[in-house]
């Protein structure tokens, strides 16, 4: 090709950054304080709460149970440390409660999945529905792809009975999915399956082994342990000290262990002092933004989003622990 015309490069005009560093920092702190104030005003000393019962969104509360759960769900504390040989008192107590609960739930789940006459989804408890949803939608569809979403027929009567009408059990739904070839048996291992019964047995065996080591399933278990009060707020807050998330305060720590320090009051005090931030707890609301401009010139003086993050730790080799938090 021929060059029609060419212009030699030259230096362009100067570019000036109008952001005011101090104003940027102040705006970020102001957003954090404002969010903390909103969370504190809505925080309620109840473990479980259904916001759909409220007629107006302005009356919606934040159950403190959600705050306790956020320590585990958002990995502020590390649940993997609970079962170590050097675990501290609160960690040990929580782990013992958890292991017993997990064994009971896995046993009940497997019993229902093996039972052709298991209750319909709509007749299950709220907690058991959450486990069934996790198994079907999260584990089998999204995580493993064993249940192939692109093969499922949305207008199929049995699909509607499961997903919309909720009139059948997961046992019946999965067996039907096998008959319709919605199950990818290659994901179950190297075994050859000659019948629908063998495929279903393979699915159950896979589920049982997967759930034993599934940290996301463990988080769901902890959520309901906290909602029921089986794992207490005092135990969770004590673990914050045991794992060094906050500097050890012997008086407060021992008070949490022996019940003299109330976990709800503790959470409120840490939010008020911003030792715990809205961004860490990730309760609603937990994010905000602000743009400050000079009204005379239109220059942007501050442009802030909360919570902020260090993009250097999320590029090239990603810092996964930082990403999760």
Describe the residue ranges of each PLM region.
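Periplasmic/cell-envelope proteins involved in peptidoglycan metabolism and beta-lactam response
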Residues: 1-325
